[in-house]
Amino acid sequence: MRRFRSVGLVLGVVLFAVLSACSSSGTAGPPAASSPTSPATGTVFDKAISPAVAVLPFVNQDGHTMTLDSLKGQTVVLTDFLSLCQEICPLTAGNFEQIAEKVKASGVSSKITLLEVTVDPARDTPARLKVYSANLGAPVNWQFWTGSPATIAALWAEMGVAYEKVGEDPGERPIDWWTGKALTYDVNHQDVVFVLGADGHEKWLTQGNPNLQGGSVPAFLVAYLNANGRANLASPGVQSWTSNDVTAALT
């Protein structure tokens, strides 16, 4: 996955009703009318998701039909991904793994959903996502969603996240980790992480490369990293985000 370079815990004793955190500039995220604040990392704002998008039907890795509305009452950490990404998404999985562990340690797993929604609905079927989730050892509150191309497009248009299908370089045809077949295309996409409040509103976002802060990529995906992915792991760059940034946005 060759990325677009630009986009637009509840861990204390008390679960705060209003999420706060700390800002990255770019095209994804709230409109100017949202008047977001911009502390140290990420952008804090409050934006309702379109009612039409909130009821769009997705399918999770267990084959269950889901909607964003069905997650109301939960705090949701949302990001875009594809299971065949070799550069950024495996690192995102590493940070999500850290977040899941911190949420569990704080005893609030029942109140937090980690949600990855594909930008590659043609290949990321529920069956593939089931295997992907199992290989990651993802806990029950770490969900993977797919849907029709129209549903996926509507969600990411609402969130301001761009993606596009591109052909693979004929000389660099990577192998599908599940089927063992050479891949014929990739999906470029922006790398954005959102927090949705229990009211279903967007509350916070950040962007850039995941910084694992010395942590590891899940074993299942280590071997799938390409040269760019290994370089991103070693040196995420200035514009990056950590699991601590996200957990700070959940307090």
Task: Name every feature range the model reports, one short phrase each.
Residues L68-F96, L115:
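Short active-site neighborhood of thiol/selenol oxidoreductases, capturing the structured segment around
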Residues N141-W142, T146-N228, N232:
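Thiol/selenol-based redox catalytic cores and closely related redox-interacting motifs
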Residues S23-G26:
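Bacterial signal peptide processing site
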Residues P51-V53, T75, V187-Q190:
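Short, small/polar residue-rich loop motifs at catalytic or cofactor-binding pockets
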Residues A93-L155:
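Structural microenvironment flanking redox-active thiols in thiol-disulfide oxidoreductases
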Residues A17-A21:
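C-terminal motif of bacterial Sec signal peptides marking the signal peptidase cleavage site
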Residues S35-D69, G94, E101:
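N-terminal "domain-start" segment that seeds a small globular fold
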Residues M1-L11:
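Bacterial N-terminal signal peptides that target proteins for export
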